C-alpha cells in the first residue's frame, strides 16, 4: 500500500513538472515577435556554437535566420567578446 502511494505521488509530481515546463516553453515562444525590417533575429557570442544563440525575433515571410557566421555582422560586446549578429534572409 505504501509503495503504491509513493508511486502515485511520483507520477503526479512528474506530470505537474512536465506541465510547468510546457507552459514555460509556450510563454517564451509567445514573447517572440516577428522580426521588423533589418532587426537582429539572433546573436551568437564568441564562436559559432560556443553558447546558445540569443533569439530576438522570428523570421517570417519565408525568410530564415542563418547560422552561417560568414553571413553575420560581427561586433565586439562587453570585454571584447565577439558577437555574431544575424538578420533574416
Curated annotation (Swiss-Prot):
Its main location: secreted. GO terms for molecular function: toxin activity. The keyword Signal applies. It is found in: Secreted. Expressed by the venom gland. Belongs to the scoloptoxin-11 family. This is U-scoloptoxin(11)-Sm4a. Keywords: Disulfide bond, Secreted, Signal, Toxin. Contains 3 disulfide bonds. It comes from Scolopendra morsitans (Tanzanian blue ringleg centipede). Transmembrane segments: none annotated. Residues 1-17 form the signal peptide. GO terms for cellular component: extracellular region.
